[in-house]
Amino acid sequence: MGCGACCILWVQSFTMTVVYGADIGLIHQQLNQLLNPAACKQVWFQDVNKLYDVVLNQNLFAEDTKPILIHNCSFLEKNNLTKAELHCLKTLKDTDVVVTIYSDSPANALINDRAITKYACKPVTAKTIHQVISKAAKTLKLNLNPDLIDHLATILPFNLGVIEQELRKLTLLSPAELQDKKMLEAVLCDYQTSQILQLTDAMVRLQTAKALKLIERLFLPKQLTPPQFLEFLANELLLALMVKGVKPQAVFQLQWNVNPFRLKAIQSQYRFWSTNQLTALINAIWQLDIKIKRNDGLAIHLLKHFVLRFFAQK
């Protein structure tokens, strides 16, 4: 699966091309189909003024001019563009430039402009993940049977970049080890963010039995340590505090180094938790982290006790 239909050569046409989507792995896949990123002048977006200067100073008529590749052009994620942003967009449209936007919903001004070439990177879903894994495995010359692909589809997150990175680990295994599901989980599940999210979701939804069962699954095979989970949860609660008073649509305008879709999901998940409750839980996490590091052998017991206290907060 990819965002584009075929591989094409880059042609000097002085037009703006946009590649967008929430999965950065898919964005890079599309870029490699469109052009050779190494042959471009690569720029990471910081602010509109700096970007405008880079584009304005580009000598379009020089023989050695390279197309510009602008990564994570975040100002084009929002609909209410300022005058300066609109002016920058107009300049980009008259430039030999490729822009990436890490969002499934870029600005309407961009989407509705027929003069801009656009490539939408559709996210990996439950319907497509088997195909994505099969294609990535084929590229890496991994011989995975359908049963193995089914198993991988249950433990890998829906993100091409992560899938490719994890499958590269499997190239180091022998054919016999590839058929051993326990070996696969030991290699691939060092830090299962998807399962951590399941645990935090169960806690927020007050599903006590499910949360305790997930703790057994996460920590007993040693694929994740309790302090790692606590660090993840504390960061999530801090983000929940930070977006507490932000309007849902304004989340996409925040200039934070966090995926806005994750921020919106966190905001929705913790919407019924008060500021005092979130603060108390963060303090409890810090205290528990110290206890666990002093009593490593009791880590699972202490974590289960913490989860039960978590539910008591509600």
Curated annotation (Swiss-Prot):
Repressor keyword on record: no
PROSITE patterns noted in UniProt: INTEIN_C_TER
InterPro entries on file: DNA_pol3_clamp-load_cplx_C (IPR008921), DNA_pol3_delta-like_C (IPR048466), DNA_polIII_delta (IPR005790), Intein_C (IPR030934)
Molecular-function annotations in GO: DNA binding; DNA-directed DNA polymerase activity
GO BP: any one term: DNA-templated DNA replication
EC category: transferase
Key word Nucleotidyltransferase present: yes
Keyword set, alphabetical order: DNA replication, DNA-directed DNA polymerase, Nucleotidyltransferase, Transferase
Catalysed reactions, semicolon-separated: DNA(n) + a 2'-deoxyribonucleoside 5'-triphosphate = DNA(n+1) + diphosphate
Enzyme Commission code: 2.7.7.7
GO CC, alphabetical: DNA polymerase III complex
Subunit comment: Component of the DNA clamp loading complex consisting of tau(3):delta(1):delta'(1). The DNA polymerase III holoenzyme complex contains at least 10 different subunits organized into 3 functionally essential subassemblies: the Pol III core, the beta sliding clamp processivity factor and the clamp-loading complex. The Pol III core (subunits alpha, epsilon and theta) contains the polymerase and the 3'-5' exonuclease proofreading activities. The polymerase is tethered to the template via the dimeric beta sliding clamp processivity factor.
Protein role: Part of the beta sliding clamp loading complex, which hydrolyzes ATP to load the beta clamp onto primed DNA to form the DNA replication pre-initiation complex. DNA polymerase III is a complex, multichain enzyme responsible for most of the replicative synthesis in bacteria. This DNA polymerase also exhibits 3'-5' exonuclease activity. The delta subunit is the wrench that will open the beta subunit dimer.
Family designation: Belongs to the DNA polymerase HolA subunit family.
Protein name: Probable DNA polymerase III subunit delta
Gene name as annotated: holA
